[in-house]
């Protein structure tokens, strides 16, 4: 089996739970066809660089996949049919990177920097 990284962009008007459900559908589809998803990352609702099908934002997800080519082809076929999916891209990689992706690592780092500020700097409103 080969290793793949797969990014899916779903429409902005679906809920985060529906985007997560889409990821679970992809996981079930790949496992039915002899594949395995090693990692699923939901990147959240992000701005698109340009409008796609009248959408300015999209729910991004990254999947690290270990599956045969036929399973990946079937997954892509199902994504083409799904109306909630704006775009997707699958690339073949030499090995799966199971660490946190740079997108999530940066977001966690930024959240960590914000929370380090001491709380006693705030003066009460007079």
Swiss-Prot record:
UniProt cross-references to InterPro entries, sorted A to Z: Ribosomal_bS6, Ribosomal_bS6_sf, Ribosomal_S6_plastid/chlpt, Transl_elong_EF1B/ribsomal_bS6
Cellular component aspect of the GO annotation: cytosolic small ribosomal subunit
UniProt-recorded Gene Ontology molecular function terms: small ribosomal subunit rRNA binding; structural constituent of ribosome
One of the GO biological process terms: translation
Region (Disordered): 107-126
Entry-linked Gene3D superfamilies: 3.30.70.60
Keyword annotations from UniProtKB, A to Z: Ribonucleoprotein, Ribosomal protein, RNA-binding, rRNA-binding
Keyword rRNA-binding: yes
Domain of life of the organism encoding this protein: Bacteria
Protein family per UniProt: Belongs to the bacterial ribosomal protein bS6 family.
Its job: Binds together with bS18 to 16S ribosomal RNA.
Protein name: Small ribosomal subunit protein bS6
Species this chain originates from: Caulobacter sp. (strain K31)
């Amino acid at each position: 089996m080969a290793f793949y990284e797969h990014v899916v962009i779903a429409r902005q008007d679906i809920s985060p739970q529906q985007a997560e459900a889409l990821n679970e559908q992809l996981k079930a589809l790949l496992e039915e066809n002899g594949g395995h998803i090693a990692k699923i990352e939901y990147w959240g609702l992000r701005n698109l660089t340009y409008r796609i099908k009248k959408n300015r934002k999209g729910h991004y997800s990254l999947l690290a996949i270990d599956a045969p080519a036929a399973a990946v082809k079937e997954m892509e076929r199902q994504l083409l049919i799904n109306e909630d999916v704006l775009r997707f891209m699958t690339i073949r990689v030499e090995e799966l990177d199971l660490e946190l992706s740079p997108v999530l690592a940066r977001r966690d780092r930024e959240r960590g920097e914000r929370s380090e500020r001491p709380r006693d700097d705030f003066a009460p409103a007079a």
